[in-house]
């Protein structure tokens, strides 16, 4: 008798890891419950705090279908859902002590604990149901006369079967449970109408003890609870059968072939029982039979293929039993066993640990798949016999999984042989056939004959044909995967052996063509006559027929051979290919629909590469065409399938921003590093930033950015060429004068430097950022003289605000997309003593929104230090970070620094005027665009305040004006709830220069700015007239000249749409009385008579610069540069008299305004025309005040904003921010804040817009240079080369890439509203490299370039064995040039080698040829029109097809003659 052999566990530590229990379970360990999934601890639930005993823990599924863990304690229970994306938990009330809990099909059963003195005659229920954690407990209703008594306890539950044990009657009862909805069952309610006067009397017995009284009271309360609540019924129990059994200790069950087997063990009698129940869908289970076994231990072992009962007899023999399949004895004698998953662990009489697994854990997935398919084909009983033979082959004969499967298949056929195969001893058999060849099955047939002699395969008579056909379809499925060809060949050889025995000549011929090696068939005569079915079905031949007819022809599938339809799901590749071909040949389906179908079927690009090359050619042709004509509605899966990762990266970004890593930085050569040390003029102070690779690409044609770097460098030594000076620099006083001029110029640089380095850093969490310090050292060249300004000149007061600006530049250099900026990082970078550097740093972080991460209590620590610049930086930074949010905490912080917001009668604030100025400006930022009435009223009162004090100076009133404008920005007359404030009329009083109080004159700039910002872009002509300048000379004399500039700019910003970039518009803005003075080229001397003209022109240029900010408008640039040249010329005119000097000051101020306006228009473009003029302004050595130098460097910074990666927006907030930053009243000295708070000069950061489009190579992940075609809404077309700044997004219609190196990518912004926002957020175009060398353009030069081409068809053809002979047509064609495509086709045909051609290769080639033939006609012509590959001309395809068909015919004819 055959016995299964076990394996010895060599390492005891591995005994629990040999097999995973592929389910989840819970275990009670002390005061905790462990949830274990696949033998790995998943979660731990601890109940130490509850101080209650854990009575039960189980996994169940409630009526809602949700899976949950239920833990029952003394009086409460916990429910934890464990499904996908569901971590809900509930606490349930348990009004009794729980004896046991069991999982049910719709929740759980709870069995309460019964006390020993409980009245046994009561009908008080003791088993309850819980169907949902939010529901009440429900009761069980009984169908029939049989009911549960108080002595019945649930001992086992499996599916709908509930097993109860009655201790009193000593019997097992089997019940069928059915769930009913308690809410729908209105008639079924718990009725307890009888009074329980004898058992549950409401009167206490005075003779009861204390403990009796407590128990009595508890039961009374329980009874009352059930009676009062009227619990509903949710489950019906129907009695099936009862058996008198004594002392049952354990229960288990197995299910097979519709029969449920429940086992129980009576250890005292050493007996086990099997109760068999027939399960019928939608019907009540019924009892079949009961069996008795002699056993000292029983347990169920369940695998994917087999379910058995493990029986250990008193003699130590172990066997696997099942009423539905043969018994499987295990070799040896054993003391004990245990089951873990599908593995049986045994301990033999010598104490050796052994194991055996019923699951087929073969490394060969083909065997697993074949077993799964056969399981569908064979009935359960026959399959268990088949799998039993497989287990015998594995464990009795120690075969490999492949050999065991083949042996079990062959055993089904050898059972019916007339002449039994001679059986040799197993040991000799293993030796004799250990060197068996690849394609014969002597060893397997020998084993199969032994299996067929021990197992009863007689019922397989009707299943031999289905088995053979099933294996045939498995082999056809394998033909669609070129990777598994060796497995397919082995299966085909097996099929050839089987069909030889069955005498199926057509099938034998079909398989014989596939076997290149000599196959040794073992003769065997089968007694059963199995008629040869039609066929054989060939999936590849079917594809050829479909392509030839260009329609889907019938496919003889499994159903045609009488096999169950459910088997079809086991052949996914065949089904998928049939659906794809149907889609391809459907005239109503496009190639894009075919791609969508592939995604729906789960076909990936990697899976496509495993198809035979003929099918792969079709699919890749479709994918390549679809890649050029992708649908904008495609998801990531479709785009990845067609290899358009560029489009996928844009439409479905995995990260919101592509941030350069430190690994992306350029690696410098030693020579470049040493040159920066030996030659100070080559130092590039900004070259360290990670975006340098992009900026270098943007300005790759010259060194303009390097020049800006040098001009805005304030931390390196400055070299001065002495020959450029007309004065003698040999004297110390003159040297000091020059040094002091250069010192002031250096101090004015940081704001511009901050613009240049904006957003260039992404610091690490542990990285400490330090500001670059000022370097005032001068080197006079030629020579070696080094000079520095006197220490008395460089005071703390002199450098305080420049140091503040250095800190702001450092904070702004940190990208707003950095994720590592938090409270800890800010505190890590805080110096021990607060400095102006750190104050500016806080402001810079706030401008980029990073102060939202700063904890509130840290803000209080900063503010209580009473450090003025720190308070200013923090207040403005918080207001900027919380821009427009009206955050309550930040409002409180700002309010306590503004006297106007304190309650009446409050003490005077001990706060500097500059801090209060920052506070009032911060209110405007915090309440931006909110139309907040209270804040609007306060700021307006501050503008018009008449009291004179150091606080209420022009700078404070201007800040109040900006704040009022920000609160109501661009709202115009649409100010809800503020009509009674009469903003326009009251502000107009503040604007008037004829005011009674001189303090109102100080408030005029603030009033002008407030009115301008409130009515910005509204085109309100009435308000514009009120702010406009008068047209007569007499009235103009009443106005301050600098206010004229503000009025002109303000009026134009209100009349936004009227501003035009042409000279006619400029001329129209000038009053008639000044037209005669309009031509600045005629000015030869400086005269105060022209002050009004200069201010009017500067105001016009300022408004023009803001109107076209960031657009790069060439006409606006031309106008502004023209005026800039004129003003620069005026700056060089001599100013000797007082009148001339006064005029010169105005000319310099107007020059800076025009320069800033020019830079605004060309922001980020680093335009050379503007740069040349700014370089001249920077290089002036004559005494120029600090403000003029600051304006020049701000113009330089805005011109090269972010190294060319950023530009300016034209939103309302952006224009307002630029108006505040470039306010045309610049400080005279570094300490000057009287007219305008210097910190506010940094609000330009709120106007920054990232518009630099950065293409990057998908393969290398590096930026690359790509031509772009940008179509604007006006119809203008721009040819650009990215990386480059794009025009404003709202003016772009479409962006598309050009060139031959990458797939063309077109982004249509007009027809896809989401694309504009995607482009704004990503700024990156990921491009797929692609060789666009087209055979259509150069068909004659294609062959010499085959090694470089990326065409998938040629990649397949040139690697095919058909073309790898010594006279390969590709080699021949590459050596000759011809102007005739037909001659190339002849060369290809003449050099064809058809040796060793298998059926799959031939059919694959036929598919390829048939596909290209069909592409010229019918449905495929419409889909592939003008896109057929021209290197395979139609003549070539016809000739090659003829040769292939001739070869097929000759091959078949030769076989027939043989």
From Swiss-Prot:
List GO molecular-function terms, semicolon-separated.
molecular adaptor activity; proteasome binding
What are the GO cellular component annotations?
A: anaphase-promoting complex; cytosol; nucleus; pericentric heterochromatin
Instruction: List every stretch annotated Disordered.
Output: 186-210
Gene Ontology BP annotations: anaphase-promoting complex-dependent catabolic process; cell division; metaphase/anaphase transition of mitotic cell cycle; mitotic sister chromatid separation; protein K11-linked ubiquitination
Bias kind Basic and acidic residues: ranges: 196-210
Repeat (PC) residue spans along the chain:
873-895, 959-982, 1006-1024, 1099-1124
Which keywords has UniProt assigned to this entry?
A: Cell cycle, Cell division, Mitosis, Repeat, Ubl conjugation pathway
Highest taxon in the source lineage:
Eukaryota
List the InterPro entries hit by this protein, alphabetically. Answer: Apc1, Apc1_3rd, ARM-like
Role description = Component of the anaphase-promoting complex/cyclosome (APC/C), a cell cycle-regulated E3 ubiquitin-protein ligase complex that controls progression through mitosis and the G1 phase of the cell cycle. The APC/C is thought to confer substrate specificity and, in the presence of ubiquitin-conjugating E2 enzymes, it catalyzes the formation of protein-ubiquitin conjugates that are subsequently degraded by the 26S proteasome. Mutations to this protein prevent the exit from mitosis.
The Swiss-Prot or TrEMBL record describes its family as follows: Belongs to the APC1 family.
The record's subunit annotation is:
The APC/C is composed of at least 13 subunits: apc1, apc2, nuc2, apc4, apc5, cut9, apc8, apc10, apc11, hcn1, apc13, apc14 and apc15.
- Could you tell me what this protein is called? Anaphase-promoting complex subunit 1
Q: Which organism is it from?
A: Schizosaccharomyces pombe (strain 972 / ATCC 24843) (Fission yeast)
